[in-house]
């Protein structure tokens, strides 16, 4: 269902911290033009943790409206309370989204059985396709391959965004799940290797400002043309790494503003503006990447 470069879209805001509709439209048009395979609306990069539930729903619905069926939309619907995750997921059932991205519950650190029961409950309360999202560096809990395998038995749990950066995970998961279970990287620096090991694509932060390059890289890799894919990835590697010097999405929002994709790099507290030292490193990485002009 989902293969190639999928963007983890930033949520543009004006200087007052309100959602910027015009910048969101520009971002969506940019990804349609450059053949990004899908948009994730309101994931980690979209600042889900600092939006109210009403804003969360508003942004997803606005993204759907502005995309106008030109590109598939995946909605982030995870929460650390199972009832809240179910409620949010059900709000989108008739919206037109293609799937939900459901992060592991953060802060409360459930056991593997707790994680299984959490995702099982969501699956049983909706018909929407679910993509599991494992990012222990953010959430404080790790969805292990054995638990992923148990969850893969549910028909509407169709895959996982695996963002540990641990390439051994793909081998472990692949051995335990059916061939049609989607394995999607959530880590730009290791995404190409992830695809080469059998993954179907990446949900990418870098794609916010390098949509064409990420689409080309993933397409080459999925075709088995790893020489061409690596040529692109080598240009992007410094950029991949520099975008995580500070917590995501601080660097990517600043860079998106710098190249003219959004009007403001406003973030909500506790996220704070980018440091000057980080700007310098990103500017060097941007120059090395030699991206297509916007």
From Swiss-Prot:
Keyword Cytoplasm annotated: yes
Primary enzyme class: lyase
Molecular functions (GO terms): 4-hydroxy-tetrahydrodipicolinate synthase activity
GO biological process, one term: diaminopimelate biosynthetic process
UniProt keyword terms in alphabetical order: Amino-acid biosynthesis, Cytoplasm, Diaminopimelate biosynthesis, Lyase, Lysine biosynthesis, Schiff base
Pathway the protein takes part in: Amino-acid biosynthesis; L-lysine biosynthesis via DAP pathway; (S)-tetrahydrodipicolinate from L-aspartate: step 3/4
Site (Part of a proton relay during catalysis): 44, 107
Annotated EC: 4.3.3.7
Pfam families: DHDPS
SUPFAM superfamilies assigned to the protein according to its UniProt record, in alphabetical order: Aldolase
Presence of the UniProt keyword Zinc-finger in the record: no
GO CC aspect terms: cytosol
Catalytic activity line of the entry: L-aspartate 4-semialdehyde + pyruvate = (2S,4S)-4-hydroxy-2,3,4,5-tetrahydrodipicolinate + H2O + H(+)
Localization terms from the record: Cytoplasm
Active-site residues, record numbering mapped to chain: 133, 161
Binding site for pyruvate: 45, 203
Function: Catalyzes the condensation of (S)-aspartate-beta-semialdehyde [(S)-ASA] and pyruvate to 4-hydroxy-tetrahydrodipicolinate (HTPA).
Quaternary structure, from the entry: Homotetramer; dimer of dimers.
Protein family per UniProt: Belongs to the DapA family.
Classification via NCBIfam families: dapA
Protein name in the entry: 4-hydroxy-tetrahydrodipicolinate synthase
Gene: dapA
């Amino acid at each position: 269902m989902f293969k190639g470069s999928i963007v983890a879209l930033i949520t543009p805001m004006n200087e007052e911290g309100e959602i910027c509709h015009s910048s969101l439209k520009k971002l969506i048009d940019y990804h349609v033009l450059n053949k990004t395979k899908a948009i994730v609306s309101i994931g980690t990069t979209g600042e889900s943790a600092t939006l109210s539930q009403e804003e969360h729903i508003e942004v997803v619905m606005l993204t759907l409206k502005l995309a106008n069926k030109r590109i598939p939309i995946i909605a982030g619907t995870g929460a650390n309370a199972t009832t809240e995750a179910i409620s949010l997921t059900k709000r989108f059932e008739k919206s037109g989204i293609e799937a939900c991205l459901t992060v592991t519950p953060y802060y409360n650190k459930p056991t593997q059985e707790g994680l299984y029961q959490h995702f099982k409950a969501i699956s049983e309360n909706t018909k929407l396709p679910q993509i599991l999202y494992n990012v222990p560096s953010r959430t404080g809990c790790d969805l292990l391959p054995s638990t992923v395998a148990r969850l893969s038995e549910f028909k509407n749990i169709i895959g996982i965004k695996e963002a540990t950066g641990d390439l051994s995970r793909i081998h472990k998961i692949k051995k335990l799940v059916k061939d049609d279970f989607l394995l999607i990287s959530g880590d730009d620096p290791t995404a190409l290797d992830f695809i080469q090991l059998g993954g179907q694509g990446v949900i990418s932060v870098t794609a916010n400002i390098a949509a064409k390059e990420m689409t080309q890289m993933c397409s080459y890799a999925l075709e088995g043309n790893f020489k061409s894919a690596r040529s692109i990835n080598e240009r992007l590697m410094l950029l991949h790494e520099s975008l995580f010097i500070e917590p995501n999405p601080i660097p990517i929002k600043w860079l998106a503003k710098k190249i003219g994709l959004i009007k403001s790099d406003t973030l909500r507290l506790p996220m704070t503006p980018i440091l000057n030292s980080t700007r310098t490193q990103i500017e060097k990485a941007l120059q090395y990447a030699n991206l297509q002009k916007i």
